[in-house]
Amino acid sequence: MVMCWWCFEADASHGCPVKMSKKTLSVVGWFCHVRCVKAYSVLMASSGDQVFRNSPVLTDVAAGRRVVPAPSPRILLDMGGKMSRAEWRDVLGTDRVYSEAGWMQDRVRGAVWPV
């Protein structure tokens, strides 16, 4: 059992792309969802880690679309937040964005509702 490096979910099978050549995509880490990959890559790139400097863009390229980063895992119940793992997985399946104010927003429809 390998855990996600972002949300600690027990079903991790994705890697974070750090380098791309014509035939190879080099990845590091283990993640349960492409949105967790994107969130981790954005965090690491913004911290100045040179290994991850291109990872946010490479994640989009590898996924074939613009990927919305997963919310912070601090919102999960088992980390002191208000969101269950089931709700978390539902959010990962959409393009919803969680803000620090505690609101979910559906970017496609523009609907806003409290968590």
From Swiss-Prot:
User: What highest taxon heads this organism's lineage?
Assistant: Viruses
Q: What is this protein called?
A: LCDV1 orf2-like protein
Record organism: Frog virus 3 (isolate Goorha)
